[in-house]
C-alpha cells in the first residue's frame, strides 16, 4: 500500500542495510529473507521544510518471524534504519535490530517497548538481543576520479541504552576509470571480532550470539557472510561491458573463526586463506542470466576448498 511518500506492506523483502555494496554487519542478503510487516518513508521536497537537508532522509522499519534450528520457535526480528543526507555527497545512517519473543518469552506491549527503546540487559526482558550502530558514506572527485569512502560500526551489546562492543567495516571505491567501459574498483576491510570491554564483557564468541538468540535466519548469519569472530580484506571490481552485461570480480584474504571456537557456524577450527570470485550477469529483457565461479584454498564445514560454479536463470512473464 502506498500513501504519498510512504509504503506499507507484508512480504518477503531482501534488505541490505549498509553503504557497502557487498557487506552489512547487521542485515544483508546472506540469509534468506523472512515474511515481515514493513514500512518505508522518504523525505520529499513537497514536505516544504526550509532547509534542503531536512527533506533528504529515509526511514525503514519491519518486524518478522525467524526460522532457526537453535532459536526459540517463532522468535521475531525487529529492525529500524534511518538515512540522512545533511550535505551533498555525504550520507549518515542509524540502524537498530532486536530479536525478541518466541515460545517461552514475552511478546506483549512491554516486550515490544523494550525492543524499541528499552534497556534489555536486566529484568524480565533481558532475553532480548539488540544490535545497533551507524554508518557513513562520502563521495568526492580527485583528479577527475570519483571516489567514495564508507564505513559501518555495529555494537553487539548496550551500556546505558547505547551500543557497545563494536564490529567494523571500512572501505573505498574508485569509479569510471575508462571512457569505453563503466568500471568500479574497491577495497574493503570487514572485522567481526570483538575484544573484551573494560568491564570484562563481550570478547570472543560475542558477535552474532547471545544467551537466547543466534543472530541467524535458517541458520545463516543475518549480517556479514564471514559470520562472527572473523575478518576479511578484499579487492573487488565491476565492469559494465554493455548495457545488458556486467562482470564482477574479487580477491580477498579471510580468517574464519579467529579464536578457534569449536561451536562456530562456519568452521569448527580456525581457517585462513584466499577467496576469489568471477561473476557475470546478462539482462536480456524478460530473461536474466547469472553465472559465478569461486575459488577458495581453505575448507569450511559446508564447503570444500577448490573451484565452485553456480548458474541461475530468471524469466519474467
Which residue stretches match the model-derived regions?
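Outer-membrane beta-barrel channel domains
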Residues: 1-86, 182-189, 206, 211-229, ...
